[in-house]
Amino acid sequence: MALDWVGNLVSIHCGPTLGVYQGEISSVDQTSQTISLRNPFHNGVKCTVPEVTFSAMDIKDLKILEISKNSIEVSKQNGPESSSTTLMPHVGRKDKGGGGGGGGAPANSAPVMVPNKAEPRLQEGGVSPVPHYSKSYGERHIDMAVQGKGFRRRHNSWSSSCRGPNQATPKKNGLKNGGHMKNKDDECFGDGMDDVLDEDFDFEGNLALFDKAAVLSQIESSERRGNGARSRGTPGEQTPSRYRHDENILEAKPVVYRQITVPQNGSKEYSTDSGLVVPSISFELHKRLLAAAESHGLSLERRLEMTGVCASQMALTLLGGPNRLTPKNVHQRPTVALLCGPHVQGAQGISCGRHLANHEVEVVLFLPNFVKMLEAITSELALFGKTGGRLVSNVKDLPETPVDLVINCLDSHENGFLRDQPWYKAAADWANQNRAPVLSIDPPVSGQAHAVEAKWSLSLGLPLPLSEGAGRVYPCDIGIPRQVFQEVGIKYHSPFGCKFVIPLHSE
């Protein structure tokens, strides 16, 4: 009876101290109640000794992983007329109260079911038809080592690709034919990745280990702890070890959105993209501010230069910026029409046209002929003439086709009678009939409707209370120091940040 167990693959559980051993049964001694395994694996790792022996007192549980072919044939010979299944003996611990017959199986041992004649026999390749769904890595290596007639699959080889899936060439068993050397070759040169690649990943089992509800509740509790920076709290409170990406370690002061206050609130207030409130100022306060800045050294020439730079930067952005002004688009240079009057606002427009012409923009400057011009206009015209831009004094010489942008500098803050001049009306009509968008530089505050409907308006410093016809307001920083604002009664903190021109939103 003991010989029936030889050749079977078993897994022996010896408790938490000794662990689990797996291997092929080499001998069973009923007298001394011992069992020996060859090619053993201890906890999935192959042992260094070729054989280990276990006493029945150390065995907690014994499982049969694979029944050898000889055991099945013996069972069929002993009971051919039996029922569909035959019970195989089970080696376990000796019962404490047992008398004679030391080879008996314990009462609580589970019988092993052996298939009858109707079930399929072993295949020619020596692979057992019994499914092995829960074998460990070490158990599968035992299967590969003890299958005498099995074959080992090789990836990327011609022989395995030419044969069909069931046309395996059986190995020759025995020491004569080099079976022992073949096993050594497999241990030395074999890649253990074949069995790993055949194993399917258990998605459902791993998903069951993830407690999704607990993780979501932890995230929600961390989000409910507070919005913004954490406070220090009382000494008894535990400071959290981790902060969110939008939290500050140091306490932040509350944001003050009204950082600019004026002595007389204008009729309009604006706000920046970050929420800062920018109040408008009257034209009288605007004049006092420019006069105070000029007395401290911010001359008219400096102001014209700063206004021209800021206006040209905004115009270049409106024209397309780096997407339009590239060396590959030399054949598609943008065209800008400048409409200027004989005043300081016109000089600001000429300065803007000079900077645009320096950036490879085709500029057409309209300026009516006057016997006497302001000195600022004369100096700006001299510089503009060196850029290659075109200067016209008649509206008929302006482009007939739509241009890319129209810059309006026709209006003056103080000379409102210019609107009645023929050249002014003709230039305003041309701008309204042209399909190009209009940018107004430093438009005035007047009760009348704007002669030229603008899409954008550029203001110097703090904006004026402009009407809806001025379009969207963009203030520009012309370099007025903070103490100059304080001299005229304005509490000022720069809303520009890292830019010189920012958009404003009407409140």
Curated annotation (Swiss-Prot):
It is found in: Cytoplasm, P-body. Keywords: Cytoplasm, Phosphoprotein, RNA-binding. CDD domains: LSm16_N (cd01737). Residues 188-295 are annotated as: Required for interaction with DDX6. The modification Phosphoserine is found at residue 128. GO terms for biological process: deadenylation-independent decapping of nuclear-transcribed mRNA; P-body assembly. Residues 75-87, 157-170 have a biased composition (Polar residues). Pfam families: Edc3_linker, FDF, LSM14, YjeF_N. Residues 1-68 form the Sm domain. The DFDF domain is unstructured by itself. It assumes a helical fold upon interaction with other proteins. PANTHER family: ENHANCER OF MRNA-DECAPPING PROTEIN 3. Binds single-stranded RNA. Involved in the process of mRNA degradation and in the positive regulation of mRNA decapping. This is Enhancer of mRNA-decapping protein 3. The lineage of its organism: Eukaryota, Metazoa, Chordata, Craniata, Vertebrata.
